[in-house]
Curated annotation (Swiss-Prot):
Interacts with DNM1L/DLP1 through the TPR region; may form part of a larger protein complex at the endoplasmic reticulum-mitochondrial interface during mitochondrial fission. Interacts with MARCHF5. Interacts with MIEF1. Interacts with PEX11A, PEX11B and PEX11G. Gene3D superfamilies: Tetratricopeptide repeat domain. It holds the Pfam family Fis1_TPR_N. The C-terminus is required for mitochondrial or peroxisomal localization, while the N-terminus is necessary for mitochondrial or peroxisomal fission, localization and regulation of the interaction with DNM1L. Belongs to the FIS1 family. One of its GO terms (cellular component) is peroxisome. It comes from the Eukaryota. The keyword DNA-binding does not apply. One of its GO terms (molecular function) is lipid binding. It comes from Bos taurus (Bovine). This is Mitochondrial fission 1 protein. Ubiquitinated by MARCHF5. It is a single-pass membrane protein. Residues 144-152 are mitochondrial intermembrane.
Length: 152
């Protein structure tokens, strides 16, 4: 599962599916499979803007898909949001998937990895906030010391 989360699309694949998508769009109608393939490539990009574009395409597909297609769309919506570190959204999608498919092992593993990332980032976030608080307290102490020395 971690390979799926960390896999990067090749430039060749991205360009190939982008051309196909734009060609169909110019002709007036993009097939669901073409839109999904392009979105899937974008979600695996190293650029956050591409990932967001891929997520928008997947969200657009969601109401149009069959139950099986929707499962794939929701899964990649979770993956894309994970890659953007939008863990709350990723969790929402993966838990929605688990409500309809409680035995889906891929979704269970993805949920576990999202929870793990949230805990890791939460601890890192708390350490940063704690460090900032210590810095502010230290600075206030130094200012207080300087003020008291200047008065004496």
């Amino acid at each position: 599962m971690e390979a799926v989360l960390n896999e990067l699309v090749s430039v060749e694949d991205l360009l190939k599916f982008e051309r196909k998508f734009k060609s169909e769009k110019a002709a007036g109608s993009v097939s669901k499979s073409t839109q999904f393939e392009y979105a899937w490539c974008l979600v695996r990009s190293k650029y956050n803007d591409d990932i967001r574009k891929g997520l928008a395409l997947l969200e657009e597909l969601l109401p149009k898909g069959s139950k099986e297609e929707q499962r794939d769309y929701v899964f990649y919506l979770a993956v894309g949001n994970y890659r953007l570190k939008e863990y709350e959204k990723a969790l929402k999608y993966v838990r929605g998937l688990l409500q309809t498919e409680p035995q889906n092992n891929q979704a269970k593993e993805l949920e576990r990895l999202i929870d793990k990332a949230m805990k890791k980032d939460g601890l890192v976030g708390m350490a940063i906030v704690g460090g900032m608080a210590l810095g502010v307290a230290g600075l206030a102490g130094l200012i207080g010391l300087a003020v008291s020395k200047s008065k004496s």
